[in-house]
């Protein structure tokens, strides 16, 4: 999340992914003020004429928040409230309006007092490391950007190579150029590029992009042991031990380790973990939760209840990670009841 502190009450934000939208859902409360650009339909009253359909104009307003909700399917946040200020005198104050906040939209949040955990949520969003994953062979290349635990895919790029059975004038450098251009569109400052796939193509591609002036500032890493290219190669990598080793500081690697530990404890019949909302809620009441992973499914079941629960855990210092169905790990957590946690000590169920 891109943030800018204006003064002690005002902070401007631009969410960069679905994790950021979730954090804003946890931060924005009833009676906060949201300032941003929107559109309103203005109608002109004219005597002796047909009803005016009105003109849609762009206007900057301040909205006093009454209700806020996530729309997980469309990756957006709906903020409802009443208009308290506007840049156009034709927009009446006190009328209801909704902001639809999407990824890369900007707003300013005004609070009478910012709580420490709210500021921490903004700062934690700024510290996430990004990885561009490239699963390449001579036939095609899968490309995805991993930020936090969210995996965003680009369409596969096909080389046009005819394979061993056909004689073609295949130019692999043209294929590499296409893949490089695609990577350049999603790379962000501080990202690393991780390249894998069968055979020697991955090394040849790594050498190719390291000659590019535009990509020289990015760290490039070639990974062995992932023997498939395309989208399948990306999924294979995110489930591998290699991912945990080379991306040990990433959220996905940490979450993967937590899930592995939960499954190990379950096999040992240990009571030092929880699965599902009720078990985790009870453990949190005792202050026993050390780290917790929850899926987007848990939010959808009862949004406000879950938001209150997450904020309570944040205040208790629990390490929390959100996952979604873009990764195999997210699907596993959903299958385990949407929430799993590791405990500081065993508790009786």
UniProtKB/Swiss-Prot annotation:
Record's protein name: Protein pelota homolog
Subcellular location: Cytoplasm
This protein's domain notes: The N-terminal domain has the RNA-binding Sm fold. It harbors the endoribonuclease activity.
Gene Ontology CC, one term: cytoplasm
GO annotation (BP), single: RNA surveillance
Main location: cytoplasm
Cofactor: a divalent metal cation
Originating gene: pelA
MF terms in GO: endonuclease activity; metal ion binding
Taxonomy, superkingdom: Archaea
InterPro entries: eFR1_2_sf, eRF1_1_Pelota, eRF1_3, Pelota/DOM34_N, Pelota_arc, Ribosomal_eL30-like_sf, Transl-rel_pelota
Pfam family, one: eRF1_1
Entry EC number(s): 3.1.-.-
Binding partners and assembly: Monomer.
